[in-house]
Amino acid sequence: FLPLATSSVMWMRTTPIDPGQTVVILGQGIVGALCAQIVRERSPGSVITVDAQPLRCEISSKLGSDHVIDVSNTDSVKAVKELTNGKGADVVIECVGGNTGIRSFEQAQEMLAPEGVIHLISKYQGAPLPLDGDRFMNKQLIAGMRIDQPRERCMADAAEMLIDGRVRIFDLITHRLPWEQTPEAYHMLYEKPGEALGVILEWD
């Protein structure tokens, strides 16, 4: 988990977040779940997480998100607007990626508050990302990570967070399998995302 936690620290320190702002994290896979915990060091007013898998929503709730939106049965844009009294999110962090992430990016634009920021940290495939110029007036879009701190410093901070429990990883582990079942592990992750999140391969 340390490499992903390190990258998550760098991403969250790249994102321009002011204390008290509302942060929405789209996608609660491993990276999204790590970011939802690490972003707390930026003192947001509220952290809202969004996913389409009930299992991931349940885990996100256990990890302390202020609000969890299950988009399998809820309109995420409408829910975010309601939770922010119509304003929208100050910051939206897009962690879905892939083909599904294209629609998620559209929703990010719809739920973003005036002068808000969308931070893309996922990889996308298929069609180009749709950007609505009118909707994006007076807003910011950033991608990747730009940070003055060296990766080694962020890795040390990530390790400290894992050790002292500020970032909880054991809740992310849904399965432990012997290494001989590596193909089954990948099949589970790609074909049954509603049943698995973190799969650990064990060598005895």
Regions found by a protein language model. Give the residues of each.
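Active-site PLP-lysine loop of aminotransferase-like
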Residues: 143-149
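A local structural motif
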Residues: 44-45, 88, 166-171
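Residues in the short beta-alpha loop(s) of Rossmann-like NAD(P)-binding domains
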Residues: 52-53, 124, 147
